[in-house]
Amino acid sequence: MRNAAGLFMIIEPDKAVLLCARRAYRSANAPAADMNDTFLEKISIPRGHRDCCDAKVYETAVREFVEETGRFFDSAFIYKLPFTLQWKDDGVTYKYLIYVGVVRGNLINVNAKPNTYTVKLLPGTFGNDYRIMLKPRRFNCEIARSLAIVPLNKYFNYMNDKQLITYDYSNYIEFFDFVRSVKARFDNRQLQDFFYATLKKIDNDAPQKLHALRRV
């Protein structure tokens, strides 16, 4: 489980940053007549698995957020304790550590199509300040998803009415309560429960330039 994490970001005052897909993985190789098969996770939280460069669990969550949405935040408050989200779908149990955060300001476009690149987080001066570097990805097995920014209550209602009924089991209801609790803590300025993180995009050749300058 520590190798899988996601980031549920809220844009003030009450909108969630999500992904929207139109078809299922199982439809990828199906005949054309079957391409309208329902995707059981039509609306999903940006998430993924740890890679060798992720030193901390929340770094996996942040990196996957940037890779899957094609956006990054200039700064955000992220709740220190993640929620263990799990569900069982078609006999398979999924489990992710989901961090909940609040974006300060706007999301910034990385100017690249989601999942066509990998992200490397380079630590900055402070512990949760990162520079992000993009590297083209040679292969992409992800299905196409688009960015969906929707009101929190609309997302909760959609999940309750359309998506959760397709699962054998899930603790999404508890997760929704967790999100509400985190948002209430933020609104009440209980910022000691959050850590402050910043991201800054750099050119791919910036580290080489910096290294060259240091040698002069």
Swiss-Prot record:
Motif (Nudix box): 48-70
Protein's UniProt name: Protein ADP-ribose pyrophosphatase ORF38
PROSITE patterns referenced in this protein's UniProt entry, alphabetically: NUDIX
Pfam families documented for this protein: NUDIX
Domain Nudix hydrolase: 1-177
Subcellular location: Host cytoplasm; Host nucleus
An annotated GO cellular component: host cell nucleus
